[in-house]
């Protein structure tokens, strides 16, 4: 049975978690075997979105209904997600990479290191310029940080330069990037990081 790399995708509701997974999987699935687990509180809406997108066969996507606080299912009691991983591997024992999308949560949400090997935390510009300055644990501790929806900056009065400076203060040298996932702007940086830092591709 495979021992896949597991990458957690966290962030507030509407930041672009599902869209990020859809875009990344569309690219990487040409090169490797991938599975996805989505977490929603009372529905399997994100699972349906990914299935309808056609980026993966339905059998490679599992939706988990967490109930209650979404961060509990990715940190304190991740048993439902562990079970979903086992089910994915029973269906497809060649899976090399699994994305685990958390339910929409606050800036403090982090993944259990027993559940994932790496994590990406995504916010969007529309939430306000001050978000990186708040220094939530999701942003600080994630292995890669994404600030999405850069196209909205002029409409909400957000300075991308200030957001970058604030991010550097809290993340030090940990990588981050800006994206506009509607146009794929910044997507290459995310994929390059995944290949280089999690899959160790291109290293010699």
Curated annotation (Swiss-Prot):
Signal peptide: none annotated. Its main location: cytoplasm. Transmembrane segments: none annotated. GO terms for molecular function: GTP binding; GTPase activity; nickel cation binding. GTP binds at residues 11-18. Belongs to the SIMIBI class G3E GTPase family. UreG subfamily. Facilitates the functional incorporation of the urease nickel metallocenter. This process requires GTP hydrolysis, probably effectuated by UreG. This is Urease accessory protein UreG.
């Amino acid at each position: 049975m495979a021992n896949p790399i597991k990458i957690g995708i966290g962030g507030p509701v509407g930041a672009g978690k599902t869209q990020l997974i859809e875009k990344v999987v569309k690219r990487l699935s040409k090169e490797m075997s991938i599975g996805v687990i989505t977490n929603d509180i009372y529905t399997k809406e994100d699972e349906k979105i990914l299935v309808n997108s056609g980026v993966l066969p339905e059998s490679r996507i599992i939706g988990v209904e967490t109930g209650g606080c979404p961060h509990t299912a990715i940190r304190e009691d991740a048993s439902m997600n562990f079970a979903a991983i086992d089910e994915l591997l029973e269906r497809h024992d060649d899976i090399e990479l699994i994305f685990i999308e958390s339910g929409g949560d606050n800036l403090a949400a982090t993944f259990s290191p027993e559940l994932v090997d790496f994590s990406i935390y995504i916010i969007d510009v529309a939430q306000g310029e001050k978000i990186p300055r708040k220094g939530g644990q999701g942003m600080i501790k994630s292995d890669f940080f994404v600030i999405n929806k850069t196209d909205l900056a002029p409409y909400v009065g957000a300075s991308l330069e200030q957001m970058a400076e604030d991010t550097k203060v809290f993340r030090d040298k940990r990588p981050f990037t800006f994206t506009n996932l509607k146009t794929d702007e910044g997507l290459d940086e995310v994929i390059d990081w995944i290949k280089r830092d999690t899959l160790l591709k291109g290293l010699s």
